[in-house]
């Protein structure tokens, strides 16, 4: 038994290292994500208190701003230690952090498959790989520059949307793997319990687009436990004691939602929300329309796999003679639907209030789309458990999905506001920041830095607010040795030099 446990742990470690390495290469070599716009800069150099702040621009989005600043500070330290240029270090640190989140997300599904579906090692690992492949296949409808589940508008959105969604989805899958386990803070396992508190704290105070799935799951779990307690005659005080952690998560999440309504938009630019501009009913109509448009842009193979999963679940349910296994399958898949529906409804409402266009962004709808893919994978897991020989087809399916996802062109879009190739975006930002460093080394106290001409009124994403915060940040880490004032000059010549398309004259 101990030998099997040791083998499983080594297998887990190897699998996690493989996923981490693959994602690290993807986000540092293939599709790097450098900072570019004002939001990226602000939250990279920001020093946010790790508590909710009523009235701030982002009152309850504590986790994104803490992690974004951590990424920036580590990158600044690496630059000061001469390990590389600042943008290169920032891309590397971000790649490591994002790869860690995705690895934890994949590992959570692995635990769920093995504990709830008794999946064999080979089948479980194959299904997790398929799950990750689906994140890249889902919007692969063109030969190049396709969206995918980890794509974002800019670097800032990785911290604000993708990471919170990954963390909350991972937590839900971990809790699903142990449906009868209720977390209790007894103090008997201080390290494990303190880590649970920290992770839940970060998850709740992250972003409503991500944390809603955790709140929906906890709500459904609490209702289920309440009905059981009523059926068994458990006292109300005992119920409250048993559910203390779940109820605290719900309470804190509601506080986060209320606090968020008191804040402004990121970047310090207050804007009218959609519900106030067009009315809530119209905002809802637009959000639903945008969401269905996004569904319509999914790849044909993805839809066929979804249909195959539905047929697989139906076949397993009809073929299963054991009433207990039927009930377990019904409870598992039905349970996902139970918390997916309130999560989806809340996301649509949130989009209607903030901006209906968010309903078409993969990073904002991540938890909803992830739930659909989770249902698909669990249906296939049930099929393999009921008909073991179908598992022999999993390697063929993995190779086929990969071949239908990858193209000989630049398959996926890069995450930056100018839609530049990631390597070109890095070169652009390196030139901008190295210009500041060169001027400081020459003893200048003022410098005018050329940036790409975008055609926007403020020249977004390179407006007048991106230079001075970075210069102050460089001074903090000794990358420059004195204060320097940075002025931004949009330049057509810069565009030509880096082969960036010039904006239309109109």
Task: For each feature predicted by the language model, list its residue ranges.
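Intrinsically disordered, polar/acidic, low-complexity terminal segments
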Residues: 2-66, 75, 79-127, 388-506
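Transmembrane alpha-helical segments
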Residues: 101-113, 167-180, 215-224, 310-314, ...
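Membrane-interface alpha helices of multi-pass inner-membrane proteins
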Residues: 190-217
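Transmembrane catalytic cores of multi-pass membrane glycosyltransferases
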Residues: 25-96, 208-363
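Alpha-helical transmembrane segments
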Residues: 10-27, 126-133, 195-198, 245-253, ...
